[in-house]
Amino acid sequence: MLLLLPILNLSLQLHPVAALFTVTAPKEVYTVDVGSSVSLECDFDRRECTELEGIRASLQKVENDTSLQSERATLLEEQLPLGKALFHIPSVQVRDSGQYRCLVICGAAWDYKYLTVKVKASYMRIDTRILEVPGTGEVQLTCQARGYPLAEVSWQNVSVPANTSHIRTPEGLYQVTSVLRLKPQPSRNFSCMFWNAHMKELTSAIIDPLSRMEPKVPRTWPLHVFIPACTIALIFLAIVIIQRKRI
C-alpha cells in the first residue's frame, strides 16, 4: 500500500479521474477549536464497489504541492462497509490546519476529494493590567490574550498609538500584547478589542484606570543611594549590639 500511494499521487496529477467510481464530500471545510476532536468524511456509493476487500482509503495532507500520509488521522474502518471513509483526529492542534486529500480506492478505480481544516482558538480570556507611571500623571494599560489565528488589536476612541506585539507559544498559539500609555480622565473607560479576521470573531475587555489602579511601577533604587543607606543601617546595628554586650 505504501508503494501504491506515490504512484497514485502521480496519477492524480496527470490523469483525469475515472467516472466509474465517484467520491463525494458532505462537508468540505471544517472549522475546529483547538483541543477538540474532528472527523473528516468523504462518501462513496457501495453499489459501485461490490467487493469489500477491495476498498482502501487514506487521508493525505497537502503541503507545498506535495502530499504525505497524515499521521494524526485514524481511519474508522468499520464505516467503510457503509460507504463512508471517516478519519478521526483527536485533540486538534494548530499544526493540523491545512488542506487534505481524501483518497478512496475500489479495486482498480479510485477518486478523491479535497477537505480543508481551519483551526481556531478564540481570544476569549483577555488579561488586563493597569500600572501608574511615577512622576508623569500617566497610566499604562495592558491587554493580553492568546488565540489563533493572529488577531488585530485596537483601542476604542483613543488617539494615542498603542504598542502591540505578539509571540508564538509552544502550542503554536499567538500571545498578543497591546500596551497603551496615557493620562486617565474621570468617568472614562477604555476598551481593547481583539479582531480575528479569519474567523470573523470580535472579543473585547473594558478597563477603568481610576477604579482598578494597581501599585505603582516599582522604582529602581540607584546604587549611590542604596549602598550608603545599607552601610548606615549596618553601623547602627553593630553599635546597638556592642552596647548590649557591655551592659
Swiss-Prot record:
GO biological process terms, alphabetically, are: adaptive immune response; negative regulation of activated T cell proliferation; negative regulation of interleukin-10 production; negative regulation of T cell proliferation; negative regulation of type II interferon production; positive regulation of T cell proliferation
Q: Where in the cell is it found?
A: Cell membrane
Q: Which cysteines are joined by disulfide bonds?
A: C42-C102, C143-C192
- Impact when changing D33S: No effect on PDCD1 binding
By its UniProt entry, which Pfam families does this protein fall under?
Answer: C2-set_3
Where does the record place the Ig-like C2-type domain?
A: 122-203
State what changing L103A does. Answer: No effect on PDCD1 binding
For the Cytoplasmic compartment, the record's topological domain ranges are 243-247
Cite the Ig-like V-type domain residue spans from the record.
21-118
- Outcome of substituting R72S: No effect on PDCD1 binding
**In its keyword annotation, does this UniProt entry include Coiled coil?**
no
- UniProt-listed SMART domains: IG
Query: Which regions of this chain are Extracellular-facing, per the record's topological domains?
Result: 20-221
What does the UniProt record report as the effect of altering S58Y in this chain? Answer: No effect on PDCD1 binding
Topology class, membrane: Single-pass type I membrane protein
Q: Where are the transmembrane segments?
A: 222-242
What interactions and quaternary structure are annotated?
A: Interacts with PDCD1.
Annotated family: Belongs to the immunoglobulin superfamily. BTN/MOG family.
Q: What protein am I looking at?
A: Programmed cell death 1 ligand 2
The organism is Mus musculus
Native organism taxonomy:
Eukaryota, Metazoa, Chordata, Craniata, Vertebrata
Gene name linked to the record: Pdcd1lg2
